[in-house]
C-alpha cells in the first residue's frame, strides 16, 4: 500500500485543476512526488483465461506492452479480440492468470482490497455508456466520487466548477442528464473521471455511441486534457479513425495477442500484419471497382501497346519524414514512360507530422510508341527515388 501511495507517477495536478487536499483520510496525499520517466503501464507476458461453457477460454496470450508516461496509447481490434480485458487488468477489475500488470511499477495483482481502492482513485475511467444518475444534476454527478471520499462540500464545489470549465460545461452545472446531448453526457463522464486528479485515464469505447461530429469534439477534448494535464491516456476502440485522430502509439490486438504495435504514423503507413491491414481497409484508397474492372495485368516480356496507359501504385509511408515532391515524381515518369502523366485515384494524409497515403498514377504511352519491360523498369526506378514504394498495377 505504501509503495503505491508513494509512486512517483501518481502526481498532483493542482496547477491545472485546483484541488486542495482534504484533511479526511480518504483523500489523496497533500504532497505527491513528481513523475519520473518510464512506462506508466507495463504488461509482462500477461495471459488471461476465463472459464467458459466449453471449458477454459484464453482471452489474452503472453501480452507484453509498455505504455509511455504522458502519451495517448490506443488499443484496437475486432470485437472479442481482448481489448477490454487488457483495460480491466489495469484497474484491477480482472486479475491476470499469468504474467504481471504494473501501474507505475506496482504489480496490480499483488494489491489487497485497500490497495486496489487507492489505485482506482488514481485511475480515471470513461465508459461507452455514460452511467449518469438521472435524478442528480451535472454538478452532483461529477462531485459524487468526492462526496463518497469524504471531501468537504466547499472543496467539492471548487473542484466541480474547475472541471466544468475544463470540459466546457460551465453553463450546464444545474442541468439534469435528460436535457443533455450524447456528447455533453460524455463530457460529464470525463469530468467525473478526473475528480481525483488521476495520472492515468482509461477510455473504453468512449466515442462508439456518438455521431461522427460529436466523436471529433470528444477526441479533441481528450487531446486537450492530455496536453494540459499531462496525464497518460489508454484508449480502447475498434475505429481506426479514432486512433488516427488522437493517439501517439497503437497496439493491434487479434485473438488475444498483440500482433502489431508502434507509432501511429508507422502502423498506418506501413501495416505489417493482416489484422492491421483489414482494420485499415475502411481508410484505404482502394481502386474503385469500375476502374479495377478494366485493369489488365502485364504479360511477361510483351510490350504494352501504343495508346495504353500504365497504372502505377505509389505509396508514401511517412518513413522519410519529408514532404513528397509530386512534381519530381511525375517529371520522372514523363521522361521514362510517356509525356502524359496524371493522377487517377487516391489521396495523401498527414499523421503525426508525416505525409502518407496512396496515389494511383496513369502514364500514357501514346507519345513514344510501345513500351517494353526495360522502359517500364526504368520508369519504376525513377519513380522510386521520389516515393517509398512504387508498383505496377497493370494497364488500361
Swiss-Prot record:
Pfam families: ABC_tran, NIL. It catalyses: L-methionine(out) + ATP + H2O = L-methionine(in) + ADP + phosphate + H(+); D-methionine(out) + ATP + H2O = D-methionine(in) + ADP + phosphate + H(+). Its EC number is 7.4.2.11. The keyword Cell wall biogenesis/degradation does not apply. GO terms for molecular function: ABC-type D-methionine transporter activity; ATP binding; ATP hydrolysis activity. InterPro entries: AAA+_ATPase, ABC_transporter-like_ATP-bd, ABC_transporter-like_CS, ACT-like_dom_sf, MetN_ABC, MetN_ABC_transporter-like, NIL_domain, P-loop_NTPase. Gene3D superfamilies: P-loop containing nucleotide triphosphate hydrolases. ATP binds at residues 77-84. It is a peripheral membrane protein. SUPFAM superfamilies: ACT-like, P-loop containing nucleoside triphosphate hydrolases. Residues 41-280 form the ABC transporter domain. One of its GO terms (cellular component) is plasma membrane. It is found in: Cell inner membrane. It is an enzyme of class 7 (translocase). Keywords: Amino-acid transport, ATP-binding, Cell inner membrane, Cell membrane, Membrane, Nucleotide-binding, Translocase, Transport. The complex is composed of two ATP-binding proteins (MetN), two transmembrane proteins (MetI) and a solute-binding protein (MetQ). Part of the ABC transporter complex MetNIQ involved in methionine import. Responsible for energy coupling to the transport system. Belongs to the ABC transporter superfamily. Methionine importer (TC 3.A.1.24) family. This is Methionine import ATP-binding protein MetN 2.
